[in-house]
Amino acid sequence: MRHRLRAAPQIAVLIGGLHPQIKKKVRSALERILSNPLCGKALKDELDGLRSFPVGRFRIVYRIAAGRVVELVAIGSRERIYEETYRLITKKPTLPGP
């Protein structure tokens, strides 16, 4: 039985704004995750309990929740996704750039 997807509205907007080829790859990756949520890499330390799935230069970060639900936490470029995810789960504000 397939899992259900839960995502914050801002993640849906982010996916909608991606380049069509990347959007197609993200949707394909989400289908794979929903079919087998353990397919992503288990994260450690501060991100324990989350998983990451690669989509080219991007990463999908998610958690497996109760009731056969996969919760999307973040989607973004590999370079910044883990610090952004940490900020989101600890609700720390983004510092302004120089």
Predicted feature residues:
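Enriched for short, Lys/Arg-rich terminal
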Residues: 2-4, 16-17, 63-98
